[in-house]
Amino acid sequence: PQFKLDSGELLENVEIAYTTEGKLSESRDNAILVFHALTGSHMLAGSYQQLDNPDIPWNEELETGWWDGFVGPNKIIDTNRYFVVCANYLGGCYGSTGPSSINNSSNEKYGYDFPSVSFKDIEISQKLLLDYLNVKSLEAVIGPSIGGLMALEFCTIYPEYVNKLISISSGYKLSTLQTLHNLEQAYILDLGRESNNRNNEYLSLARMVAHKTYISLELLSNRAKSETLYDDDLIKGFLSTPQESYMMHQGEKFIERFTPESYLSIIKGWQNFKIEQEDLNKLKDIETLVISVDSDVCFYPDEQKDFLAVLNNHEINTKYTTINSTKGHDSFLLEPELFEDTLKNFL
């Protein structure tokens, strides 16, 4: 169907790739919507094969759902109780309409000409998906990382539709550091457009800029192998340490499973994200949980404390907890056991 974007532009033949886990109750009110992180996907839990997904970029990281440790029968988000929905973002590269889709006016892929998509566009498209799935109301909306920003804004758009909000390693606005990191990555990707088919190398570099905020320095040091993998002639005078090799490897793995055009589309939406503080008053009837990770250097703990203070100023019913982890921002992907009690008790 046709979809009108925040910008006023129209997208034709919009498709949203999604997965569901569990069963919708007869009262249609046991659903949980999960917004994924920047480079995540709708493939939330369980196992996946490239043969079943021939039209999307792929590597072995996609063979297991990105939140498989959290979602499933008798897991933290128990699919014996809940109907869990996760959708790939509009503008993404995992099956939803995005830069890899065909532009009807040219019969070619949109590429970098794909229209600007706001986070609000993504949220509205996912509400349309929930309507299609016949979901009457949501027991919870959950979002880690930038998914937490979308989960929050979703609740301000549809406050009567949501019972609970869970924001994990996220916040309510961009920090100065995030704004600058996004600019750096966008500039790198823009250079890649004019680089004679080297745009994947530029995507790899953009990923390295971001990746160092996803893990703690301690984890980076522990993960880096003792031997180096690269000839130091590649970048003269560099790549002699395992930490450098580790970051190069992360960038190279990433370009197997993502596209520069979708990466730029989503960080552009992030860069232009803004919630007016008065809109937070709409959360009055929504129970809210804010989870911080003490070693997070993407969304720093101080940002969650600021978020909590703003919610308290608006008299929003909010619980707050800090996870103690050495793994940084990516703790929400790697350590379900640390989140288990908090999430189960809140749900």
Tell where the protein language model's regions lie, with residue ranges.
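Short beta-strand/loop motif that positions the catalytic acidic residue
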Residues: V290-S292
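Catalytic active-site module of serine/aspartate enzymes centered on a nucleophile-bearing elbow/loop
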Residues: K305-L308, N312-L347
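N-terminal cap/lid subdomain of alpha/beta-hydrolase-fold enzymes
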Residues: T19, K23, S27-S100
